[in-house]
Amino acid sequence: MNYKPLFSRALGLDPERLHFAAHSHHLWPDASFDGQVRAWAEANRFADRKWDLIFGEVIPEAQGHVARELSLPSPDSLIFAPNTHEILLRIVSAVDKAPVRILATDGEFHSFRRQSERWEEAGQAVVTRVPLAPFETFAERFVAAAQAGGHDLIFVSQVFFRTGGLFDRIAELAELADPAGPWVVVDGYHGFMATPTDLSTVADKIFYLAGGYKYAMAGEGACFLHAPPDFGPRPVVTGWFAEFGHLEGPPGGVQYRTDGGRFWGATFDASALYRFNAVRAMLDQHGLTTAMIADHARGLQARFQAAIEGGEAGGLSQADILNPVDGEAPRARFLALRHADAPRWKTALQEMNVIADVRDDVIRFGFSLYQSEEDVERLIHACARLD
């Protein structure tokens, strides 16, 4: 099946480009353009009244899409924010202990990595980081560290951004979660709409954050948080949007919503939610599910992996594939290859108008709907020129 017509605007801007960085900046489908135009039109048509429309229609629609994607029991557990860093600050501000004792890994995305390092410098947190390597034993080591206790907050990625490794022991962490501590926070940015994710059995125990920049195909500004009931009822970092709805709190004190809305911030650019809703409507119209998209990407990944292992992809055959395709198992939507020449390969490919990206000594190739089997063959041909 050829899905390129859904991305005609983005692909038409550079028809010769091979974009294999869908895990980084996913190209936007045509539907997102229509959503952006609608956001502009409604902002100017309704002006000051647009927020009634946004909170009355746009946000509930987006909440519904996320809730259905993750099998959440209620969309009311969800809020949106411009980025996950804001969400992280609000969650940690709700921990009523100092310094906050955090269990994490050495492979978290920069939003958490940098902020947690600064909290440590300021004496506001004590962070224990479990090494990802060797990844074959990581899950066992991390769960054991969590079960050992002594933490207020446990932070871990569903899919690790650099290596593409997948953590599949969330349910065991959820068993440890308690409103009195520890809290479990899952960074799902490389999992949401990349691989089917069902949170129905852990939704009352874990925080889950992700966004629209990658596999949701909606661009920046559409990050979200699922907050379990009773965890963090009064975040210190709070915006005035958290005042809307049913409120509770001490007499004369700051009042909070009792659902996920207690983590709302303040005024934000809602156009990202218009794009997200438009993209989800497009997927529904074409009967495309996350499982179907993941299967399409898996087939492309498998062919590229076979070419690497078979010596068809030039110097890439010298690299270690950190997250190889393994049957039908859930996986990242990118292949991560480690080699000292990764930065040089990325630059050489870019000169051929082939887009991948690199993290230190890891080059990543991301796959999605707008790529075809022919594109993968062209990618292999380009990589064959790498030494």
State each model region's role.
Residues 1-387:
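Pyridoxal 5′-phosphate
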